[in-house]
C-alpha cells in the first residue's frame, strides 16, 4: 500500500479512502505563509471525493484545469453537489489548536457576514468549533479530517494527535458547514491555491473521460 501513496510535500496520502464508499484523492496541496521572507508550510491537504461528482459538473466538460481554477461557479457547483466529500489535513509546522481555530473562525465568520447569514445560531456553532480546537496542540503529523456526508448538511471534524488520541465534533449548522467547505474548496477565495489548482486539473481530466 505504501508504494501507492501520493506524496504531498513529503507527507503520504492514500490515493483512496473508504467511508460509506470509496472516495478518490482528487486534489491536494498545502497552506503556507511568508514569514520573514521565508515560505513556511503549515499543512498538507488532501481532498477526497465520490467519483460521481463529475455527473454534477458536466457543463464544464472540455475546460482546461487553469480555466476551472479561475471559475468560482465551478467550485460552487462542486461544493453544492450532493456527493460525499472528505478533507484530510496533516500538520507540517506545529501550531496551537487555538491558532487554527481562530483562522477557521475568522474566515467562516467573514464569509457568512458578507452574505448576511451570520446570526446567533452561526455564532454558537462557530464557538463550539473554537472551543473544541483551542485546548489542543497540533504537533507535526497531527491529522485533522472534515467529513461532509452526501445528503446531510452536517460535518464531522476529527482530530488525531500523535496517531492515537481521537476527538470528534459534529457541526450541525448548515451555513457554517457550507462556509467551511468554501474555506478549503472555494475556488479563488480558497485558503490553499495549490489545492484548488490540483482539483481543477484532476477534475478537468475526469470530465474529459
UniProtKB/Swiss-Prot annotation:
Keyword flag Cytoplasm: yes
GO-annotated molecular function: chalcone isomerase activity
Catalysed reactions, as listed in the record: a chalcone = a flavanone
Pfam name, any one: Chalcone
Superkingdom per UniProt: Eukaryota
Biological role: Involved in the biosynthesis of prenylated phenolics natural products which contribute to the bitter taste of beer and display broad biological activities. Involved in anthocyanin biosynthesis. Polyketide binding proteins (PBP) which promotes the catalytic activities of CHS_H1 and PT1L and triggers demethylxanthohumol (DMX) production.
Protein name, entry field: Chalcone isomerase-like protein 2
Amino acid at each position: 500500500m505504501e508504494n501507492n501513496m501520493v506524496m504531498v510535500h513529503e507527507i503520504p496520502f492514500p490515493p483512496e479512502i473508504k467511508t460509506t464508499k470509496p472516495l478518490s484523492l482528487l486534489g491536494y496541496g498545502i497552506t503556507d505563509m511568508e514569514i520573514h521572507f521565508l515560505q513556511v508550510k503549515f499543512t498538507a491537504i488532501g481532498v477526497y471525493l465520490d467519483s460521481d461528482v463529475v455527473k454534477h459538473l458536466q457543463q464544464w466538460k472540455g475546460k482546461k484545469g487553469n480555466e476551472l481554477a479561475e471559475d468560482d461557479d465551478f467550485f460552487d457547483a462542486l461544493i453544492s453537489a450532493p456527493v460525499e466529500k472528505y478533507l484530510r489535513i496533516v500538520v507540517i509546522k506545529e501550531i496551537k489548536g487555538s491558532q487554527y481555530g481562530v483562522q477557521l473562525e475568522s474566515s467562516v465568520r467573514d464569509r457568512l457576514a458578507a452574505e448576511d447569514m451570520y446570526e446567533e445560531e452561526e455564532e454558537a456553532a462557530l464557538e463550539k468549533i473554537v472551543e473544541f480546537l483551542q485546548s489542543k496542540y497540533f504537533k507535526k503529523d497531527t491529522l485533522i479530517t472534515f467529513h461532509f456526508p452526501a445528503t446531510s448538511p452536517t460535518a464531522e471534524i476529527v482530530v488525531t494527535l500523535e496517531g492515537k488520541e481521537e476527538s470528534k465534533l459534529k457541526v450541525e449548522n448548515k451555513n457554517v458547514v457550507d462556509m467551511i467547505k468554501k474555506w478549503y474548496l472555494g475556488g479563488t477565495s480558497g485558503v490553499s491555491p495549490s489545492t484548488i489548482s490540483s482539483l481543477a486539473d484532476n477534475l478537468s481530466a475526469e470530465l474529459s473521460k
